[in-house]
Amino acid sequence: MKINLIAVGKLEKEYLNLYLSYLKKISFFATINLIEIKEINEKNIDLKKQKETELIIEKIPKNSKVYLCSLQGQEKTSEDFSLLFNEDNLTFVIGGSNGVDESTFLHKISFSKNTFPHQLFRILLVEQIYRSFTILKGIKYHK
C-alpha cells in the first residue's frame, strides 16, 4: 500500500522525531511518501491559495484517491477512518496556513472542528494512520 502526504511547508525539527517514530511503525504496513510544497510568499490570500493548490495538484500521483484534511470535511471516528485504508493508493493533503482552494478537492475529511497548527496536525495524521492499521490488523493499541 502507498500513502502520500502532501503538505505545504516544511516539518520543523521539534516535530521530526515523533513524526519519524510513527513512520517507522507504519512501515510494517505501508510506505509513506511525504511531499512538501514550498509555501508561496504572496500577500493576496486568494492568489496564494490558488498557487499552492496548483502546486499540490501537480504532485498528486496518478490513480491515487485524494483526501483533503479540512475543517469543512466529514468527521470520522478512528474506526471509520481506518476503512479508508482498504484502498491501495491514498493521498492526504494538508494545506498551508491560509488553506487551499477547497472546491478543487472531491473528498474532504476532518479530525475535529478545532484548528491545529499544521506542524502538529502532521503528527496527528500519521498517528491516526498508524492507529488505523492497528485497528485493521487487530493489534492492541486502539482502545
From Swiss-Prot:
One of its GO terms (molecular function) is rRNA (pseudouridine-N3-)-methyltransferase activity. Gene3D superfamilies: 3.40.1280.10. GO terms for cellular component: cytoplasm. Its main location: cytoplasm. It comes from the Bacteria. It catalyses: pseudouridine(1915) in 23S rRNA + S-adenosyl-L-methionine = N(3)-methylpseudouridine(1915) in 23S rRNA + S-adenosyl-L-homocysteine + H(+). InterPro entries: Alpha/beta_knot_MTases, RlmH-like, tRNA_m1G_MTases_N. Belongs to the RNA methyltransferase RlmH family. Specifically methylates the pseudouridine at position 1915 (m3Psi1915) in 23S rRNA. HAMAP family: 23SrRNA_methyltr_H. This is Ribosomal RNA large subunit methyltransferase H. It comes from Mycoplasma mobile (strain ATCC 43663 / 163K / NCTC 11711).
